[in-house]
Amino acid sequence: MGQIKPKIELTSKQQLIFDEVKKSHFLKTSFYFTGGTALSSVYLHHRLSDDLDFFSEEKFDTLPIVNLMAEWGQRHQFKINSRELEVVRIFLLEFKDKEKLKVDFGYYPYKRLEQGRIIDSVKIDSLFDIAVNKLQTIHQRNNVKDFVDLYFLLQKFTVWDLMEGVKVKFRMELDPYTISAAYLKAEKFEDLPIMLVPLNLLELKNFYKDLAKKLGSSVVKK
């Protein structure tokens, strides 16, 4: 039997940009696809996700990307608003049907822990790396999408695995109390993103409340 080719499930506008990325030698060799949309479209298929995030471990010149995006805009008839925020070049695209799409190209100087998939010659961040990034993110910001993503990722990895991943990847220690406090922020959420698999807000809140208690009690026992 032949090897099953990895699949990616994107909206038509996301697929259009992904197809342009894979045609560019510069982009497909310099960047990898990551973030919530990579997580949902390649691995978990658990929720709708809007943005396309492409990261590079090396610093890069944004001018070639700006020029490419301008070419794509002419070819596919979308308007572009572009700005730079720290180390990320952000493109806000508006298509003729008024649908909008945000595409980011960012410098992310952290070596990936595992090799991810390759789809149509585009590198995809690994499931473990995305999970480690999510754990590192939730104690810095309070976005329900990150907590939903981590909810499903914690069905596949233990929090201890991810804590060790954060230590290796970011050279930082996340202690159990910090993570427990981050988990409890889920109590403030009022709604969920559009889900593709069953999950309700009460389940999400109870999940993190229970995890926070277990994590705290495990530290006390030690």
Identify what each model region corresponds to:
Residues 1-222:
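Compositionally biased terminal segments of proteins
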